[in-house]
Amino acid sequence: MTFRIETAARGRFAVFILSGRIEAPAIAELRRLFELQSDYRDIVLDLKDVGVVDRDVMHFFARCEADGVKLDNCAPYIREWMEREKD
């Protein structure tokens, strides 16, 4: 299964709507898109349609959130995994 990234604007936020199975190779594309933004605090990752993520992506999401990126519609299993890895 592949992943997909759609972009949208929500007020002052650049929204990246992710779907599918997100694996480590997707991180480079997400970083590239982030670099096109002037401020990470203005980025939202909408994870509503994300099915599965691998460990690298989970760590990437955690770092993004720590840097001020908003994670919308984050699946409970991803959120719990991020919390467990923090400990």
Regions found by a protein language model. Name each.
Residues L18-D87:
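Amphipathic alpha-helical interaction surfaces in cytosolic regulatory modules
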Residues M1-V15:
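Short beta-strand/loop segment at the start of cytosolic alpha/beta domains
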